[in-house]
Every structure is written in structure tokens, then in C-alpha cells.
Design a protein with these regions (language model features):
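Flexible hinge/capping segments at coil-to-helix
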Residues: 154-190
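A late-sequence structural motif
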Residues: 105, 253-296
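Beta-alpha-beta core module
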Residues: 153-158, 162-163, 177, 224-273
Length: 298
């Protein structure tokens, strides 16, 4: 049993088939199939049921997948510890960033990190908090930005804590106000976030607490697109203040939102509790402490 065989097997499951696994691993489909077959032979049991182009884990495969992910994670951590001996002259940062504010908050930090550590390769994944958390637990990511977690499986470092603003069409009856209460938007169609965004849950909880269910008309993880829909008169979107400030455009007004205290965008950078953090990840966290988010004057 070899690590390359374990990695091929894990990627077949994660990517949904041999062809996609081969693309991820930069080897041919036949090479992936051969490595999985060799793994099954060495273990003496089938790990996959092959149904046409589909694959499904056998009972043994489920056990092996769990152990293989743990072994690959330990292998990666071993390599990371060895990389530390080279003082970041090489290495890899597997980083997750929130979709909503990638350009607003992280483009400059990303560039500064690359300037300081040009030989560190960055593997970047953007997504909602659920996607980031799952990727960290599986070992796909080492550290990532997420709404502050309550799950003890994660350790975290606070990054920012932003209120939400409301972006409204300029012809909305409340558009001339300086602020708006969440319950005043009960009859306005809502543009929501992707389902992987935990912020959706907080918004729904806040609305239900105030006695209404928001009228959802669409979802997106792209703040620019959501603002464009507002400008087209499609509804209201609630966005972190630091993001909303940069999205005001013709046809859109920004109002301060009055809502329950828990409806905030409190981003932390999280990692698996007890996991070894590579020097590359430690350097990223140190950079975040060096350049904290500053609240602008409203």
C-alpha cells in the first residue's frame, strides 16, 4: 500500500469518478484505475462498486476512506513540518476565503503575502462557511475564513466583525431613510446568499424572531451580481458594511440596518483544533494580525 494509491482512491471519491480524479492528480484515468486496483489487491477486498461511469463505496471502502484521509493528512503535516526547516523558501498554503469580500478585504493581503513569500505556492478555495469548514475537516484546506464557529472541532483567530447594511433600489419607499429596521423589509423581496453561507441561517433566524419569513427571489455568492440585481429593482440584499460601501451605484442606495445583534458578519480564520499549522499558515495568520480591518466612517 502506497500513498499515491491512497491519494488516487480518495480523489476518485472526492471528485466523483476516475476521469476527474486523473485531472486533479495530473495523471491519466487508466493510471488512477490501476492505482486503485493495486490498493484493492494489497488490501484483499473491493473498495468500490463500479456501475458504468459511477462509483460507490463498499462497506470496506467507507472504512478505508476515513483512514486514508487521516493518513494523507498526517503525511501532509509531516511534509509541512519539514518545509518549516527551510524558512519558507518553499512550501504550500492551502487557504480558503469567503466569497462575499474576496476583492474588498483580501486582494491586498494576498498580494502582500506573495511579496513576502514568493516561493510559497497558494492553493486557494473560495466559498461559504459550510464549504470552508468541510474542506478544513477533510484536509483539503489548512486554514480558511468563515463565520466565527461554535463547533469545538475548530480553533480560530478573529479577523473582522461587521454589521450588515441594506442595499435597496432607489425607488423603494424607504430609500430616502438613513436607516431601516429589518422588520420594515418584510414585504420586500429578498436576494439571498448561496446555501453554503451560514449567514443565510442567521438572516432567517432574525426574520423569524421578528415575525416574518423573507420572500426569497434568488440566490448568489457574488456580491457584485447581487448589487446589480438591486439596481435592476429586483429586491433588497443585506451585505457586510465593508462590502456594501463599495457597491453603491446608480439605482442603489445603502441604508444602515437595525437588526438583532447576532445578525453580523463576524469572520474568523479557522483551522482544525489540535492540527499542526505549517509555517506558511502561521505567516498568513500573522499577516492578518498585522493588518487588521479598520472600520471606515459611515
Amino acid at each position: 500500500m502506497e500513498f499515491k494509491q491512497l491519494r488516487s482512491f480518495v480523489e476518485v471519491i472526492h471528485r466523483g469518478g476516475f476521469t476527474q480524479a486523473g485531472k486533479t492528480l495530473h495523471i491519466s484515468q487508466s493510471a488512477v484505475s490501476k492505482q486503485v486496483a493495486q490498493l484493492e489487491q494489497s488490501l484483499g477486498t473491493p473498495l468500490l462498486d463500479r456501475i458504468g461511469s459511477q462509483v460507490r463505496l463498499t462497506a470496506a471502502g467507507q472504512v478505508v476512506l476515513q483512514r486514508a484521509e487521516a493518513m494523507l493528512r498526517l503525511h501532509t503535516e509531516l511534509l509541512s513540518e519539514l518545509d518549516d526547516m527551510h524558512q519558507l523558501t518553499r512550501g504550500e498554503l492551502r487557504l480558503g476565503l469567503p466569497l462575499l469580500a474576496g476583492d474588498t478585504l483580501f486582494a491586498g493581503l494576498f498580494a502582500e503575502y506573495r511579496r513576502r513569500y514568493p516561493n510559497v505556492t497558494i492553493q486557494l478555495l473560495e466559498g461559504g462557511s459550510r464549504n470552508i469548514e468541510q474542506a478544513i475537516l477533510s484536509g483539503e484546506l489548512e486554514v480558511g475564513g468563515s463565520l466565527k464557529p461554535s463547533d469545538p472541532a475548530f480553533a480560530w483567530q478573529a479577523f473582522c466583525d461587521e454589521p450588515l447594511d441594506a442595499l435597496l433600489p432607489i425607488d423603494h419607499p424607504l430609500a430616502d431613510n438613513a436607516q431601516v429596521r429589518l422588520e420594515e423589509l418584510a414585504d420586500t423581496p429578498f436576494l439571498m446568499y448561496q446555501r453554503s453561507f451560514v449567514l443565510n441561517d442567521r438572516l432567517m433566524q432574525a426574520c423569524h424572531q421578528l415575525g416574518f419569513t423573507p420572500k426569497e427571489i434568488g440566490r448568489s455568492g457574488q456580491a457584485d451580481f447581487l448589487a446589480a440585481l438591486v439596481a435592476a429593482g429586483q429586491g433588497v440584499v443585506l451585505l457586510p458594511s465593508v462590502v456594501a460601501r463599495g457597491l453603491v451605484r446608480p439605482g442603489v442606495v445603502r441604508l444602515t440596518l437595525k437588526a438583532p445583534d447576532f445578525l453580523r458578519w463576524d469572520i474568523a480564520f479557522i483551522w482544525r483544533e489540535g492540527a499542526y499549522l505549517s509555517r506558511a499558515a502561521q505567516a498568513w495568520l500573522a499577516l492578518l494580525r498585522e493588518f487588521p480591518v479598520k472600520r471606515a466612517v459611515l
